[in-house]
């Protein structure tokens, strides 16, 4: 838990504080809403057609630190993955900007922690309402920078906004305890207090929702944040900063430092090793998560991490084929297969295998349409970059070379270098890359199995365990398998399981902690035991 000390000004607006441990000078008027200068027109000239006509206030290109929009010494380009067109040039923050953002967040924390839960709740609710009022523009930003189909982008904005709504309500439900001790003259109190400044590092596949799921909980708890968005999708984070400012979130409470891939490593290390940071929250690859854990270890920071997955999708003989296919379509091809909870391997019992594969292939051909995310009817957009396409292509070629059969798809799409055909493979075996390497693309490999025990063994062989799915009509089997799968989340006869009300997270090397739900706010709170004697 952070203790606040006086820091020399880093140029950020400071907040007053009544917290006795914080020796920052109070400001007249109390909390100071973030200022909102207009964006520089020179930075906006490069936007492609997907962003044309959007509110200039939402199309930000500078960092947002201490309530101010600040340029960096350099900029980096952000591209539309569908067309390759330049969307704009964004501030390329470095270590200096990262440290300034942490200082701004630390100074703001000393007052934000003292704001009443009711007021924090009200501000988060205003932020939520502004997201809803601007949902169409926010969705277009997501589609432009990530390639996600516009319909899915609209869904993400609602999902993202709902986290702010949820945590605006949870802010008022942070309760402590009173414990009666064996000694009659004592009472024991358990207090919950905000942990401090949180470093928040988010991925490109859900550039809005992965921010609000973390930041909503942090701000509700009384923490402040420094957000480092993915270099592919910084515009969503910056648009959220503008709306946070409009909502009256005080200066320094929400800070955003975009940076290029070249600077990402040093910026991430700077914010994660800074002694003023008390918490790290990260969503991304297991490899990067392990690096951040090393950074956290030196100063024993609190961490929560949602890392890679290898989600099994099991279809037992008793399953309803149509339901299983519908679930497979939803769990595999959302965001073109680029989610951490996408089904990565399909385990189908021998008795139902042929019927499932046939129906799955038919559903893919009938319902999946590859195209630009802005085109009506598109269900499968581009992958985020050509490196992602190469990974899918490598897995397909490896599987075919080892005996797998391509049922449909199997190659790059004619639309462009970042597009790949939705692909279904059968005759897949466990020695193939696609069964033990997270795909993050539109590839569905099917493994035939004989017994329940065999399916469980295959599913649990992975060293990660984020999500798992299975279809069965046998009640006893449902209980057995749900309890035996080594994952943090299980979908039983359901392919879409994410909800703001439910805890999201994994086991094994899929991460630490939970996000969303009533448990999410606890990731940003410390327990303090107070023994009150002499009664």
Curated annotation (Swiss-Prot):
Q: What does this protein do?
A: Catalyzes one step in the degradation of the inhibitory neurotransmitter gamma-aminobutyric acid (GABA).
According to the UniProt record, list the residues that bear N6-succinyllysine.
126, 135, 184, 265, 402
One GO cellular component term, please give it: mitochondrion
Q: Which InterPro entries does the annotation name?
A: Ald_DH/histidinol_DH, Ald_DH_C, Ald_DH_CS_CYS, Ald_DH_CS_GLU, Ald_DH_N, Aldehyde_DH_dom, Aldehyde_DH_Superfamily, Succ_semiAld_DH
- The protein depicted here goes by the name Succinate-semialdehyde dehydrogenase, mitochondrial
What EC number(s) does the entry state? 1.2.1.24
Phylogenetic placement of the source organism: Eukaryota, Metazoa, Chordata, Craniata, Vertebrata
Q: PANTHER family annotated for this entry?
A: SUCCINATE-SEMIALDEHYDE DEHYDROGENASE, MITOCHONDRIAL
Q: How is its activity regulated?
A: Redox-regulated. Inhibited under oxydizing conditions.
Give the residues the record marks as binding substrate. 213, 334, 498
What disulfide bonds does the UniProt entry report for this chain? 340-342
Q: Name one GO biological process term.
A: gamma-aminobutyric acid catabolic process
Phosphoserine modifications at:
499
Q: Where is the transit peptide?
A: 1-47
Matching CDD domains: ALDH_F5_SSADH_GabD (cd07103)
